[in-house]
Regions:
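Conserved pre-ATP/AMP-binding loop-to-beta segment of ANL
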Residues: 15-34, 41, 64-70
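Conserved AMP-binding A3 loop
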Residues: 30-54
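Conserved AMP-binding/adenylation subdomain of ANL enzymes
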Residues: 53-70, 80-118, 129, 133-136
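Gly/Ser/Thr-rich phosphate-binding loop
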Residues: 117-122, 131-195, 207-209, 214-215
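AMP-binding/adenylate-forming catalytic core of the ANL superfamily
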Residues: 120, 229, 234-235, 261-348, ...
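Conserved ANL (AMP-binding/adenylate-forming) active-site segment centered on the GW(Y/F)…HTG consensus within
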Residues: 169, 193, 232-259, 276, ...
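Conserved beta-loop-beta connector loops within the AMP-binding
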Residues: 176, 196, 209-227, 266-267, ...
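Conserved ATP/PPi-binding loop(s) of AMP-dependent carboxylate-activating enzymes
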Residues: 202-205, 215-247, 287
Length: 379
């Protein structure tokens, strides 16, 4: 299948079968999911009942959800984002969920009119597709006022965040989540607290710290983001090597390595510089693809961008980017390189910019940096 995660083996204790009369306990497995596989082969993640309850309560508290709220769910329910943020958190609050058959930009505004929701949650690529059709649906937006919008599962460009707030007249709350955390780890707060574009916000459930990228201890400054809390999976299914590399104990506390590089500011807001495996190493110079994304997104003709590594004979890796332009744009690769050169040091400027009608995405709507060079024939 096009989006197959591969074949996996699940293991159970056949000597202690569970009978239908037994009710699940907090430590029983509730869900068996797999990671999105953005940087490696997907891994099986068992999620406990206690993980779901903890995460749903965290999200309910962050978003101040009540029984008056209606969430319009456009996220797939085979993945943690929709299952926990849209459905489980709403149920925990006693609210309502209006389920669509799946995301469709052409039907989104009709659904918005039918559902009259107070909020919805989506990945950045969905938000960008919604913005592309927003102007022609201005009347629907005006008569269906949202309390807030939410974005998670990938970095939301600050330009897109500001445009969503302008178009919908509501705050856009960016959260930081992953399957192993039963979704949410951090979240920008609702007003009147400050939202910081480019940041994934404050701790919103588990403890979040910064760890040394290769040694098992916590540090100050920039490093690997790690988490600890009751929402964290007990470990990957039948994968001793991944568990050894992803979990460690420091001063009596168990920490999970997210694989993301980041740092806190003075106010406790967390900013990510990218997946560690996606950081571009250009002859020893480490380049965050998110930083390059942010610069290119300032170009008025660019509506979507993803920066990634391409092989280089002498440097090991070099910088490349794929972009989608506004309809009718005549901007060239040379124009975009010149734009980037005026705003970045030379070694960060993409040496190749590919203009596409659509950037390849994974099954959950995430842009895929790893493997994109090969997909586009740049290897």
């Amino acid at each position: 299948a096009k989006h197959s995660a591969g074949e996996f083996e699940l293991h159970c204790d056949i000597n202690n079968p569970v009978t239908s009369e037994q009710l699940p306990t907090p430590t029983n497995i509730a869900l068996i999911l797999h990671t999105s596989g953005t940087t490696s082969r997907p891994k099986i993640v068992p999620i406990l009942h206690s993980n779901i309850v903890s995460s749903a309560e965290n999200i309910k508290r962050s978003l101040r959800l009540t029984e008056e709220d209606i969430c319009m769910n456009i996220m797939p329910l085979f993945h943690i984002h929709g299952l926990i943020a849209a459905v489980s958190a709403s149920i925990a609050a006693g609210g309502s969920v209006w389920c669509t058959p799946g995301f469709d930009a052409l039907k989104f505004f009709r659904w918005l009119d039918d559902a009259s929701p107070s909020w919805f949650t989506a990945v950045p690529t969905m938000h960008q597709a919604i913005l592309a059709r927003a102007q022609r649906n201005r009347d629907i937006i005006d008569r269906n006022k949202l309390r807030f919008l939410r974005s998670s599962s990938a970095s939301l460009p600050s330009q897109v965040m500001k445009e969503l707030e302008r178009v919908f007249g509501a705050p856009i709350i960016e959260g930081y989540g992953m399957t192993e955390a039963t979704h949410q780890m951090a979240s920008n707060p609702l007003p009147p607290l400050e939202q910081k574009p480019g940041s994934v916000g404050l701790e919103a459930g588990p403890k979040i710290r910064i760890a040394h990228e290769t040694e098992n201890h916590l540090i100050d400054g920039t490093g690997e983001v790690v988490i600890s809390g009751p929402n964290v999976t007990p470990g990957y299914e039948n994968n001793l090597e991944a568990n050894k590399n992803s979990f460690f104990t420091f001063e009596g506390e168990r920490w999970f390595r997210t694989g993301d590089q980041g740092a806190f500011d003075a106010d406790g807001y967390l900013s990510l510089t990218g997946r560690l495996k996606e950081i571009i190493n250009r002859g020893g110079e480490k380049i965050s693809p998110l930083e390059v994304d942010e610069v290119l997104m300032d170009h008025p003709s660019i509506v979507q961008v993803v920066t990634f590594a391409v092989p280089h004979e002498k440097l090991g890796e070099d910088v490349a980017a794929a972009v989608v332009l506004e309809d009718g744009s005549k901007v060239t690769e040379s124009d975009l390189k010149a734009f980037a050169s005026d705003r970045m040091v030379d070694f960060k400027v993409p040496k190749k910019i590919v203009i596409l009608s659509e950037i390849p995405k994974g099954a959950t709507g995430k842009l895929q940096r790893i493997g994109l060079a090969e997909t586009l024939g740049l290897t």
